[in-house]
């Protein structure tokens, strides 16, 4: 499992996780552009990435948060209401993921379980950050048969600033082909810029612009 970050405005410096899955409390500091989490089996490596994925999705709104939460619950193995309950460490009522960015921006994601029953949307979720905040609620009806079939047949292009990749992602219909196409397009663009710079060193990039109802490449 891994996470790709796209178009990030600022690098994550610190992540603080409380009461998430098997993690009572964990703080990772001095993070870099590329971070590798290593450890023994059942050492909560996947839980760290899940917590980060939930936080990053929450930064982009409630809808994406629910989408990523569903993917996390499904790839772990959906076993009903208890799958949601098991997000919380040892019967705790609240879990928290806090992140500080290199530019000193700070954001905090909180999930609260109001009681042992998940009926009537008893899980509250809230994001507080320097730039945007929101709150919402959800219940145990997150995973249904139609959703399970749709997630395996969808190969949508990435619309967010990050991508959470699990074994389920890799077996989605058309996913590998989609990633290959994106990589090929990137390589073609890089090759074109390199060739142009041989003749015109001042060239920085290529951008498509529409002019007189026609698309042209602006250098």
Curated annotation (Swiss-Prot):
<dbReference type="Pfam" id="PF13175">
    <property type="entry name" value="AAA_15"/>
</dbReference>
<protein>
    <recommendedName>
        <fullName>Uncharacterized protein MJECL10</fullName>
    </recommendedName>
</protein>
<keyword id="KW-0614">Plasmid</keyword>
<dbReference type="InterPro" id="IPR041685">
    <property type="entry name" value="AAA_GajA/Old/RecF-like"/>
</dbReference>
<dbReference type="InterPro" id="IPR051396">
    <property type="entry name" value="Bact_Antivir_Def_Nuclease"/>
</dbReference>
<dbReference type="InterPro" id="IPR027417">
    <property type="entry name" value="P-loop_NTPase"/>
</dbReference>
């Amino acid at each position: 499992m891994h996470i790709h970050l796209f178009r990030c405005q600022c690098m994550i410096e610190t992540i603080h996780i409380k009461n998430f899955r098997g993690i009572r409390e964990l703080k990772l500091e001095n993070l870099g552009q590329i971070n590798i989490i290593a450890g023994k089996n059942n050492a909560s490596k996947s839980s760290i990435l899940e917590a980060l994925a939930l936080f990053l999705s929450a930064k982009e709104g409630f809808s994406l948060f629910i989408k990523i939460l569903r993917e996390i619950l499904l790839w772990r193995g959906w076993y009903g209401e208890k799958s949601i309950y098991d997000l919380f460490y040892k019967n705790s009522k609240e879990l928290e993921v806090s992140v500080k960015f290199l530019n000193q921006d700070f954001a905090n994601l909180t999930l609260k379980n109001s009681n042992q029953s998940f009926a009537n949307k008893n899980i509250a979720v809230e994001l507080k950050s320097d730039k945007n905040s929101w709150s919402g609620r959800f219940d145990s009806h997150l995973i249904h048969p139609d959703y399970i079939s749709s997630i395996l047949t969808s190969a949508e292009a990435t619309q967010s600033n990050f991508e959470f990749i699990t074994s389920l992602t890799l077996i989605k219909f058309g996913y590998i082909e989609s990633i290959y196409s994106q990589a090929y397009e990137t390589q073609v663009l890089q090759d074109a810029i390199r060739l142009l710079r041989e003749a015109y060193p001042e060239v920085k990039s290529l951008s498509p612009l529409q002019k007189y109802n026609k698309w042209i490449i602006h250098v």
